[in-house]
Amino acid sequence: MRECISIHVGQAGVQIGNACWELYCLEHGIQPDGQMPSDKTIGGGDDSFNTFFSETGAGKHVPRAVFVDLEPTVIDEVRTGTYRQLFHPEQLITGKEDAANNYARGHYTIGKEIIDLVLDRIRKLADQCTGLQGFSVFHSFGGGTGSGFTSLLMERLSVDYGKKSKLEFSIYPAPQVSTAVVEPYNSILTTHTTLEHSDCAFMVDNEAIYDICRRNLDIERPTYTNLNRLIGQIVSSITASLRFDGALNVDLTEFQTNLVPYPRAHFPLATYAPVISAEKAYHEQLSVAEITNACFEPANQMVKCDPRHGKYMACCLLYRGDVVPKDVNAAIATIKTKRTIQFVDWCPTGFKVGINYEPPTVVPGGDLAKVQRAVCMLSNTTAIAEAWARLDHKFDLMYAKRAFVHWYVGEGMEEGEFSEAREDMAALEKDYEEVGVDSVEGEGEEEGEEY
């Protein structure tokens, strides 16, 4: 069995975790107490959803997940909420003291007190697995726990489980909507530390999600619940192939193989369609061609950047629901005729396609309409460098004046770590730039030879 362990770190990670597990339970018909009326074989264990849930002797399904936060209030809501019986109490780990939006506290001071406990719980989950394939880590870039503790955890996971893949789902600080002044510091420090430990990181930009909620769902003032449910749908689409019997991306490592041409350029852009409210969906039926086209609209992306200014290195389309290959091929053929989509010249313009016949599920009473078919596009494009450039610029503005740096140094960091992290980010931007440059040299002599 190819199990996958989810780790939810910090407030953002935990709240997205709530949205995701709520959705997974609905998709698999698992009740909030972990019982699954439709599953007649107790302890069968060979169903696809067993990659995400383990089954107890009593027929209860328990998520293979760990929730960690350095302060208790957010996880206390899980402990008292609707799904309190779903999780084993040991899976919900809290500290006493907040990381206070400070990377150094999450990574050094407070983080180190709790890391061994967390790894111990992860080890217990890993021991229940017959063939663990890897971890997905959910966190924000901006928070202290999300940035600092995650990077510490990723380092330790690399030591303990060297060859297992590690996927990240990271909440990128929104360009306009900010929850902390020091977000750029935290983001750049955590990216620098986790860059070599993460195999693939899906970034989600809060502002992009806000705009989608406002524009497509007509929610004037989206709350975090609205945002998280939308993010939950996206995560569910990405992981659907691991949880249902699909034909493609049945494996975490397959994502990397298809999306990551160079180890450092591992930040695919996710786009999801259709995001549509119930009132609108009642009147229109969206075809495969329409939802496929929607994926190439910057408005539906999870990160604000413009792929029309960049080049694609890889592209993966994950369909779910009532979709047949014939329609998909037609839709892709149409898109290839549009010149707006440019691939790097060293990469064949192949679109990898996965079809999952399980239609998307929605949370009852939520904002999203129940649709017959949906698609999630994962593309690795050089345009994502725009997002890093924005962040680096904000970092530079503050760091030039050494603003707020004393809070980090006071927790035992050295100022050198800042400049080292910033240099690494500059290198990352450069990497993306170089990938997009055409490989011109050496073309002259090849023309004469026909193979």
Curated annotation (Swiss-Prot):
Residue numbers bearing the N6-acetyllysine modification: 40
Co-factor(s): Mg(2+)
Keyword Nucleotide-binding: yes
Single biological process term from Gene Ontology: mitotic cell cycle
Record-linked InterPro entries: Alpha_tubulin, Tub_FtsZ_C, Tubulin, Tubulin/FtsZ-like_C, Tubulin/FtsZ_2-layer-sand-dom, Tubulin/FtsZ_GTPase_sf, Tubulin_C, Tubulin_CS
Molecular-function GO term, any one: metal ion binding
Enzymatic class: hydrolase
Modified residues (5-glutamyl polyglutamate): 443, 445
Subcellular location: Cytoplasm, Cytoskeleton; Cytoplasm, Cytoskeleton, Flagellum axoneme
EC number: 3.6.5.-
Record: residues binding GTP: 10-12, 15, 71, 99, 140, 143-146, 179, 183, 206, 224, 228, 252
Annotated site, Involved in polymerization, chain positions: 451
UniProt key word Protease: no
Gene3D superfamilies on file: Helix hairpin bin, Tubulin/FtsZ, C-terminal domain, Tubulin/FtsZ, GTPase domain
Listed SUPFAM superfamilies: Tubulin C-terminal domain-like (SSF55307), Tubulin nucleotide-binding domain-like (SSF52490)
Sequence similarity: Belongs to the tubulin family.
Quaternary organization: Heterodimer of alpha- and beta-tubulin. A typical microtubule is a hollow water-filled tube with an outer diameter of 25 nm and an inner diameter of 15 nM. Alpha-beta heterodimers associate head-to-tail to form protofilaments running lengthwise along the microtubule wall with the beta-tubulin subunit facing the microtubule plus end conferring a structural polarity. Microtubules usually have 13 protofilaments but different protofilament numbers can be found in some organisms and specialized cells.
PANTHER family: TUBULIN (PTHR11588)
Protein name: Tubulin alpha-1A chain
Annotated organism of origin: Sus scrofa
Lineage: Eukaryota, Metazoa, Chordata, Craniata, Vertebrata
